């Protein structure tokens, strides 16, 4: 909003300084000072970024109009000059207004729970597995995790969205075929968590949740959700799957970007199996608690009898696999993830499970089933459709959220309306997704709010929520 106000003031000022009167007058200097005040306010509060380049340029031009032009009427006597100036203002105005609207700063919802959220990154090395994912890397398998936890109020410093944000922005641009400049403003995203905050000093123990990101994304891609869950009394560990995440940067500076993958059922099944191995390793390390001395105070918060997992896309598929294979995982959620990996048991997971899908995903799966989509994409969507059906066993929840697509479950839904569904309300979807996920884990790990999921269905009649 501050950027839009700055643009509006700047545009009104340009009418005066270019078309009515230019030159070094008290009025013009005052107009300039007002604009520079807005400029510095936006830079301090939000940060300088590429989306505002047209505005910066126009302010530079207005400054020249005041200090380098004689005091005279600014309207040219030649019609051509008038037209050119007018067109220039129109084009600049359109750019100034549209860029911040098309590429807004991601606004994460403030957590609604009672706990302050702390966060800390850890580096894990699996000495029992060699790196087989990353080409020309024969070291032990390495992973980064980001932990979110209830913390003491007033401790720690505000956390950045992603520690190596420039590298992340660069790689997201590469994988999505976009210019690097388009993603650079990700670094302006403000979080509601505190880096290295002191873990809460309390007798209470909290359930542990593991989070798996989507293919080519990153562990913090669902910060809107990770912070909310920690504020509600969960310790949440977000995994960054090396070689499959957009980028992974280790403490020694070594960087591993995402590798190309083969889009075949066999290859995708194998990838999920690798992610299972990573997740099992992380869970083992967390339970043993010996990988980092500073983790001990966080480990003391955890109730290891109450562990769940959730994830988006391939991270969701991994959550489903962990649920049926690891007795320590008591409940799981798959957010719009095709159920790749090993086939689900005929009787279903036999433990609390929720499969959430975007309305657009369901639409594409039905089109594939009806042969309206051809090629490998059709084959993959058909497999996902059939596997979704096999999971619909007694006790399983299936959810379809209207006006959503695959990205709607992530922070990147707020990156640009260009990638949203028509009439999609990103903020409202974040609220709904958080309600569903928190209520599901509250019910199945904390034993509270037994009917809260059904209550959510009543609040959102357009929501397709079914308990099989």
What does each model-identified segment do?
Residues 190-249, 363-364:
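Short substrate-entry loop that stabilizes the transition state in hydrolases
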Residues 24-70:
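Membrane-embedded alpha-helical segments of integral membrane proteins
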Residues 78-104:
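Internal/C-terminal transmembrane anchor helices
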Residues 98-209:
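Domain-level recognition of soluble alpha/beta enzyme cores
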Residues 282-348:
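Primarily recognizes the serine-hydrolase "nucleophile elbow" in alpha/beta-hydrolase
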Residues 148-154, 161-181, 220-261, 398, ...:
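Active-site machinery of serine-nucleophile hydrolases
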Residues 243, 248-304:
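Alpha/beta-hydrolase active-site loop
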Residues 351, 357-429:
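Active-site-adjacent alpha-helix of alpha/beta-hydrolase-fold enzymes
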